Structure formats: structure tokens, C-alpha cells
């Protein structure tokens, strides 16, 4: 990995080996103890084969003898920036407030800091993995270059424990894995298809009217 040789155990993935050796491969969908999905595409790495190079998801690709892996090649960075941009572009992610296609990265940062106290900013501003990756790879969202109005989705507030704002969801699937594989409550799952996809409770109802026991595993 990145020019260094590492030992691995049968059953480990590339991401497992990297994390065990303090090599940072960013990821948004992987949750330890659950099945890898590769849904976010942020953990992709470049794998050298005898016939050339290819991109693979490190969270779902088994480690093998003789693998040559690059985690931050120019091609990898380009792809990560693209996927992060798509996620920022897909919902109401106000960490890229004021961004535009022709705005410099420095100007964007200054404008974002000036807007930091605005009420419409995301409640987890400054404590968000997606935002951290956007800053790390200098992604402002709006991949198409066109301004898109924030997604308007009713906020689910009918219970005192968990408030659900699906306009912030990037469909990483961590909450689904936590509910179905760690707690085995089977209260939430992926629903609908394409750009209408979202995390649903029961038969499309609210958490309050589903089999959710409000253990909090999905939030953690």
C-alpha cells in the first residue's frame, strides 16, 4: 500500500489492512461489524494489475498476496471529489452555502465562515464527516455548476427521541446496517428507487408508527 509492504489475515479487506496500519482511506458508508456495501464510493483505491490499473472499493475488496494499492493517486482524488460533490449536490447540505462554480476555494471558505451563524445552516456544521471530506478535497458541491434549491422534505418530529430530516440524508446506509445487523430490530430499510430513494420505516410510515424501539443505535 503506497509503496510499503503489510501483513494481512485471511478475510481482511484492503480497508481493514489500511486502518490496522494507520493508513487513512476516507469512507462514509462502512460500519464496523456489518457487511460492506461500497455505497458511498469514497473509499475507492487504485489497484495495479498485470494488465493495468483499476479502481475498487477498499471496504469490500479482499486483501490478497502481492497486491499493489494506491490510496491517494491523482485519479483517486479526482473520483473522490466527484462523488463527494454529488452527495453535496443531492440534498440540503448547507455546509456549501454560497458556493458557485466560478468561486475560488479561498473565497468560498471566507463566505462559509461569515454565514456560520445563520439559522439555515445544518445543525451539525463543524461536526460532519461529509463536510470534513468536502474541505479535505476542496469540494464545494453543485457538480453541474448550476444552482439548485435546497431539497424540501417534511421533518419528522412526531416523537421525543429522534428527529429525522431526510433532506440531509446521503443514503450511506449506516443507520440501516446498525438497525438491521447490529441491533437486529429491522425497523428501517432502503425504500423507493433512483432519485426518490430514501430510508423508510416500516411500510413507509414514521418511526413513531413503526416497530422502532428507539434504542438510538442508528443515531450513534
Question: Locations of the language-model features?
Answer:
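Ferredoxin-type iron-sulfur electron-transfer modules and their immediate structural context
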Residues: 1-215, 219-220
Amino acid at each position: 500500500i503506497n509503496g510499503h509492504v503489510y501483513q494481512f489475515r485471511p478475510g481482511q479487506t484492503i480497508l481493514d489492512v489500511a486502518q490496522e496500519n494507520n493508513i487513512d482511506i476516507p469512507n462514509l458508508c462502512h460500519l464496523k461489524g456489518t457487511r460492506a456495501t461500497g455505497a458511498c464510493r469514497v473509499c475507492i483505491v487504485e489497484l495495479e494489475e498485470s494488465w493495468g490499473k483499476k479502481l475498487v472499493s477498499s471496504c469490500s475488496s479482499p486483501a490478497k498476496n502481492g497486491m499493489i494499492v494506491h490510496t491517494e493517486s491523482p485519479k483517486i482524488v479526482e473520483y473522490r471529489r466527484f462523488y463527494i460533490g454529488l452527495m453535496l449536490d443531492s440534498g440540503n447540505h448547507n455546509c456549501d452555502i454560497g458556493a458557485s462554480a466560478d468561486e475560488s476555494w479561498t473565497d468560498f471558505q471566507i463566505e462559509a465562515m461569515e454565514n456560520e451563524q445563520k439559522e439555515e445552516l445544518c445543525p451539525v456544521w463543524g461536526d460532519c464527516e461529509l463536510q470534513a471530506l468536502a474541505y479535505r478535497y476542496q469540494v464545494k458541491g453543485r457538480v453541474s455548476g448550476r444552482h439548485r434549491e435546497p431539497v424540501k422534505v417534511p421533518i419528522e418530529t412526531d416523537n421525543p427521541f429522534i428527529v429525522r430530516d431526510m433532506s440531509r440524508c446521503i443514503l450511506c446506509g449506516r443507520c440501516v446496517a446498525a438497525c438491521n445487523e447490529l441491533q437486529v430490530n429491522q425497523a428501517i430499510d432502503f425504500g423507493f428507487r433512483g432519485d426518490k430513494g430514501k430510508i423508510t420505516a416500516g411500510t413507509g410510515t414514521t418511526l413513531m408508527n413503526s416497530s422502532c424501539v428507539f434504542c438510538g443505535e442508528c443515531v450513534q
